């Protein structure tokens, strides 16, 4: 398949720049895969689609304020990972001239480049004292949000159930849920730390030539058993799908617990094995996430749904509306 097969026209004004006033004040498109019927509902009506034997699976990763600025404000440093508390893998902008031995000052911390991982800007940096994300860091809002992060984003660009530090981006399907709704749903958690690769476009013309970014995940034995035993598994977000499909045993069909890194790339005609329903936001044209949801339904049905979403002026992307695929 071609990357261009997943393109659609999206007016800029439909890209949500801010969250709704309250969590859950969103529209919800409901897609029935068996009939092709598309409904236009409100997220507040989600309870109508919850079944007694469901298990709703959420990603409990927590977004870390991982974006820093040098004291001279000439460089932006995005923490991608940590080899130790003081040795970070970073994306530095501009970073092409940042060679081994160069130093960066962030507050009272001094970082020294100890390795060049990628000429464009990925560096290993060793700090004398690590900068503090909570007091010095900024949230790395997605590039399609055309404003700087604000204090309110620390609450709204975070799920209410986030607990495992390590994500650069939020698992945005979960942003619609408040504590009251969570308490009413039979649920459990997996962890996938969403990385900066989630924003990178597909550069290859053919899907099979695209190399997926790697992300760290964890699935406990207890949760794996609950999912195997569930009558219907509802994944809240594409990140949950990536964890579960990465952990399916090819022979038994059951889930293997554990932790590791996944580079799974899901696109048609891949058949999902561990998920029965999916709640997700609306995704970018030609993105790997649009390809994933197309594998779960079909490319034709998904593009039809997106065309209706544009015509009906749904709000798109991280702070936007959602879609329930049954």
Q: Which residues fall in each region the model found?
A:
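Surface-exposed, charge/polar-rich loops and edge strands
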Residues: 1-326
């Amino acid at each position: 398949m071609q990357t261009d097969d997943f393109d659609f026209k999206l007016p800029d004004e439909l890209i949500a720049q801010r969250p709704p006033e309250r969590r859950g004040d969103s529209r919800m498109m409901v897609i029935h895969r068996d009939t092709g019927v598309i409904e236009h509902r409100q997220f507040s009506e989600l309870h109508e689609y919850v079944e007694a034997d469901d298990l709703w699976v959420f990603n409990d990763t927590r977004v870390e304020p991982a974006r820093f600025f040098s004291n001279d404000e000439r460089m932006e440093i995005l923490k991608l990972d940590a080899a130790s508390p003081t040795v970070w893998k970073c994306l530095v902008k501009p970073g092409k001239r940042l060679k081994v031995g160069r130093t960066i000052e962030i507050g009272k911390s001094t970082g020294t480049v100890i390795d060049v991982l990628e000429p464009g800007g990925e560096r290993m940096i060793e700090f004398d004292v690590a900068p503090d994300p909570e007091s010095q860091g900024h949230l790395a809002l997605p590039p399609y949000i055309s404003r700087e992060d604000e204090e309110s984003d620390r609450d709204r660009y975070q799920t209410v159930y986030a607990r495992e530090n390590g994500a650069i981006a939020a698992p945005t399907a979960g942003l619609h849920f408040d504590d009251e709704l969570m308490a009413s749903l039979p649920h459990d958690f997996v962890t996938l730390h969403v990385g900066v690769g989630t924003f990178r476009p597909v550069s290859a013309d053919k899907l099979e030539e695209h190399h997926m970014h790697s992300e760290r995940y964890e699935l406990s034995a207890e949760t794996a058993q609950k999912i195997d035993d569930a009558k219907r598994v509802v994944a809240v977000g594409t990140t949950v799908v990536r964890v579960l499909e990465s952990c399916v045993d090819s022979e038994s069909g059951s889930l293997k617990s554990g932790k590791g890194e996944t580079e799974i790339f899901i696109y048609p005609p891949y058949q999902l094995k561990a998920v029965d329903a999916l709640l997700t936001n609306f995704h970018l044209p030609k993105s790997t996430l649009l390809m994933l949801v197309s594998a779960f339904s079909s490319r034709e049905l998904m593009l039809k749904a997106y065309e209706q979403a544009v015509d009906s002026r749904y709000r798109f992307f991280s702070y936007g509306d959602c879609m329930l695929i049954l």
